[in-house]
Swiss-Prot record:
<feature type="signal peptide">
    <location>
        <begin position="1"/>
        <end position="20"/>
    </location>
</feature>
<dbReference type="GO" id="GO:0005549">
    <property type="term" value="F:odorant binding"/>
</dbReference>
<keyword id="KW-1015">Disulfide bond</keyword>
<dbReference type="InterPro" id="IPR051660">
    <property type="entry name" value="BPI_fold-BPI/LBP"/>
</dbReference>
<dbReference type="GO" id="GO:0008289">
    <property type="term" value="F:lipid binding"/>
</dbReference>
<dbReference type="InterPro" id="IPR017943">
    <property type="entry name" value="Bactericidal_perm-incr_a/b_dom"/>
</dbReference>
<keyword id="KW-0325">Glycoprotein</keyword>
<dbReference type="GO" id="GO:0005576">
    <property type="term" value="C:extracellular region"/>
</dbReference>
<dbReference type="Pfam" id="PF02886">
    <property type="entry name" value="LBP_BPI_CETP_C"/>
</dbReference>
<comment type="function">
    <text>May have the capacity to recognize and bind specific classes of odorants. May act as a carrier molecule, transporting odorants across the mucus layer to access receptor sites. May serve as a primary defense mechanism by recognizing and removing potentially harmful odorants or pathogenic microorganisms from the mucosa or clearing excess odorant from mucus to enable new odorant stimuli to be received.</text>
</comment>
<dbReference type="Pfam" id="PF01273">
    <property type="entry name" value="LBP_BPI_CETP"/>
</dbReference>
<comment type="similarity">
    <text>Belongs to the BPI/LBP/Plunc superfamily. BPI/LBP family.</text>
</comment>
<feature type="disulfide bond">
    <location>
        <begin position="161"/>
        <end position="196"/>
    </location>
</feature>
<keyword id="KW-0964">Secreted</keyword>
<dbReference type="GO" id="GO:0005737">
    <property type="term" value="C:cytoplasm"/>
</dbReference>
<dbReference type="InterPro" id="IPR001124">
    <property type="entry name" value="Lipid-bd_serum_glycop_C"/>
</dbReference>
<feature type="glycosylation site" description="N-linked (GlcNAc...) asparagine">
    <location>
        <position position="139"/>
    </location>
</feature>
Length: 473
């Protein structure tokens, strides 16, 4: 291992979670020990890890008691040894390894205590004992440290591995008591070399999952988000905490740094047997900021974009504010040009997500085959309610208009009270603008990959400056 990694391990051992304020505006992930245990168990199911152990000691005369074992040249049971009568007993090999039961204990500030309880079936043969079959219960106990890989990902590193041999039973054949004792001693010596590599293989699989936490997630036409570790991970007796820093990049790969909230997030306590991930206000600001700078929040609304019950003509406008038309005749189509010149403001608090979009609305009279005539301009604020739906990889957002307030900025005829148009404008925005806006929001807010935790069925909790997703394993 590299010296730098050892140094990180030492520092990690001193790090334990603190309750209260989250001193970051990044993404916080709390991985419950049950989720870690499930990842380890899944790595053993259906994979090659256990099958590889079966091929370790299989060839005749190469078994535990074969040519290279106790019966081999110089072994205790070799020719001339104390038990030369059974010198031909050979080929004792692992025939089956029962799917281990996984037990996890988190050691705050230290690492992980990992136990695998399994049952090993062995068989062999000899001229005196005939077909021989043994079954042994084994507990593999290992101490695992949390470290950081050279590329900055969290990594589990095996520090110590021991095997404790439990009950051994003879399921077939005859074996003299002295030989049975020697077999037991041999298994105690050999099994660590066979089963501890299983732990190494399991950790390799889990480390691949942990490495996927720090990944580049596309944001569609807006760019991408790269998740990196902001600080060293922390360990409590119930969960591992990862402080993840989301780095937003443009399509060209340039880092985009939107303003971040100054106040830290006060995290709610995590319940036992649950995992959490937070989506910070910063990511909401980033997505809406990118939409604004890319012009995705701007829209020109024509009569074809609204249903017939929401007319866009000078006749209907005259009924609400006749002084706004000047000398224009009735029956002409209207064009509404919506421009968002500043980034929207997102408010996360009191279990509610509110989006405020400052908008400038230009109202023009559209003349067939002619240049539109500017009538007046309004400045307004669209207040939108957000509905959040988590999936496996994203937090999806859909918006609905709560209210639209406007003030007259300029008029080419007479001044008037623009608030009289708010209800009519709200109908137009709901019919035409909200659909386009929600289409742009289909990119969603990406979630970091946390040990394949599926947040699709998570409970969504909106707290101040963050959204918390909680899922039970």
């Amino acid at each position: 291992m590299m010296p730098g990694v050892y140094a990180l391990l030492l520092l990690w051992g001193l790090a334990t979670p603190c309750l209260g304020l989250l001193e970051t505006v990044g993404t916080l992930a709390r991985i419950d020990k049950d989720e870690l245990g499930k990842a380890i168990q899944n790595s053993l199911v259906g994979g090659p890890i256990l099958q590889n152990v079966l091929g370790t000691v299989t060839s005749v005369n190469q078994g535990l008691l074969g040519a290279g074992g106790l019966l081999g040249g110089g072994g205790l049971l070799s020719y001339g040894g104390l038990f030369s009568l059974v010198e031909e007993l050979s080929g004792l090999k692992i025939e089956e390894l029962t799917l281990p039961t996984v037990s996890i204990k988190l050691l705050p500030g230290v690492g992980v205590q990992l136990s695998l309880h399994t049952k090993v079936s062995l068989h062999g043969s000899g001229p005196l004992v005939g077909l021989l079959q043994l079954a042994a219960e084994v507990n593999v106990s290992s101490k695992v440290a949390l470290g950081m890989s050279p590329r900055g990902t969290p990594i589990l590193i095996l520090k110590r591995c021991n095997t404790l041999l439990g009950h051994i039973s003879l399921t077939s054949g005859l074996l003299p008591t002295p030989i049975f004792g020697l077999v037991e001693q041999t298994l105690c010596k050999v099994l660590p070399g066979l089963l501890c590599p299983v732990v190494d293989s399991v950790l390799s699989v889990v480390n691949e999952l942990l490495g996927a936490t720090l990944s580049l997630v596309p944001l569609g036409p807006l760019g991408s988000v790269e998740f990196t570790l902001a600080t060293l991970p922390l360990i409590s007796n119930q969960y591992i905490e990862l402080d993840i820093n989301p780095i937003v990049k443009s399509i060209a790969g340039d880092v985009i740094d939107f303003p971040k909230p100054r106040l830290p997030v006060k995290m709610p306590p995590k319940e036992d047997h649950t995992s959490q991930v937070t989506v910070p206000l910063y990511l909401f600001n980033t997505v809406f900021g990118l939409l604004q700078t890319n012009g995705a929040l701007d829209l020109d609304i024509t009569p074809e974009m609204v249903p017939r019950n929401i007319p866009l003509t000078t006749t209907d406008l005259a009924a609400l504010a006749p002084e706004a038309l000047g000398k224009l005749p009735p029956g002409q189509h209207l064009l509404l040009s919506l421009r968002v010149m500043k980034s929207p403001m997102i408010l996360l608090q009191n279990k509610k997500v509110t989006v405020s979009i400052p908008v400038t609305i230009h109202v023009l009279s559209s003349v067939p085959q002619g240049t539109p005539v500017a009538l007046f301009q309004m400045n307004g604020v669209m207040t939108l309610n957000a509905h959040l739906v988590p999936s496996t990889t994203k937090l999806h957002i859909s918006l609905s208009l709560e209210r639209l307030t406007v003030q007259l900025a300029s008029s080419f005829s007479q001044p008037f009270d623009a608030s009289r148009l708010e209800e009519w404008l709200s109908d137009v925005v709901r019919a035409a603008y909200m659909q386009k806006l929600n289409e742009h929001l289909e990119v969603g807010i990406p979630l970091p990959k946390i040990l394949n935790v599926n947040f699709a069925n998570s409970v969504v909790d909106v707290i101040e400056n963050a959204v918390v997703l909680t899922v039970a394993p």
